[in-house]
């Protein structure tokens, strides 16, 4: 089964790349699961301006980049969003990327790894509301890297974060397995 780890920031100098690197090192080999890192910055997605609702478009999109994004997301059985928190909410580029699609998200499990001044807790709670619209199954385990403690002078997660990540992956894989049947 495939878990898509979405690198959800496109800013220059983004912390998301450092978080993704740490996740790659700490997820390791997981029996029966492949973790694919999907970098939002690798897609030239337009602002959503479709003539129809993505949920009703049967995965047939007018834009080649949206189609490529759709295929990358559709191939996944579950997701981890690496998300910053901007102004107490979700990053616009990732929200736009989510809104551009529809059925590709439906019914799949999702977990969150946030970072920011408070560990992106407000962004993650906002993402949970958004995910519920797609009938996604959100994993309550989450990681929230706190800027003042873990991102001063580089990216230095506290030692217990690896254990938290393992618990998050265990639960996400459990959900993915049950949902896939």
Residue ranges and their predicted role:
Residues 36, 104-181:
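FMN-binding flavodoxin-like domain, especially the glycine-rich phosphate-binding loop
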Residues 58-134:
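Helix-loop-strand module that forms the ligand-binding subsite of alpha/beta enzymes
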Residues 1-83, 89-93, 156-181:
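N-terminal beta1-alpha1-beta2 submodule of the flavodoxin-like/Rossmannoid cofactor-binding fold
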């Amino acid at each position: 089964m495939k878990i898509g780890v979405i690198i959800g920031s496109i800013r220059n100098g983004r912390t998301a790349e450092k978080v993704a690197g740490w996740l790659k090192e700490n997820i390791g080999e997981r029996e029966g699961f492949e973790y694919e890192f999907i970098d939002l910055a690798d897609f030239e997605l337009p602002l959503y301006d479709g003539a129809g609702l993505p949920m009703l478009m049967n995965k047939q999109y007018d834009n080649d980049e949206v189609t490529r994004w759709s295929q990358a997301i559709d191939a996944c059985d579950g997701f981890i969003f690496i998300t910053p928190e901007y102004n107490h909410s979700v990053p616009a580029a990732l929200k736009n990327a989510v809104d551009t699609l529809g059925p590709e998200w439906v019914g799949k499990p999702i977990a969150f790894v946030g970072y920011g001044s408070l560990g992106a807790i407000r962004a993650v709670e906002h993402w949970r509301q958004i995910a519920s619209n797609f009938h996604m199954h959100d994993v309550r385990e989450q990681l929230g890297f706190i800027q003042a403690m873990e991102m001063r002078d580089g990216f230095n997660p506290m030692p217990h974060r690896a254990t938290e990540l393992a618990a998050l992956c265990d639960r996400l894989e459990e959900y993915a397995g049950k949902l896939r049947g």
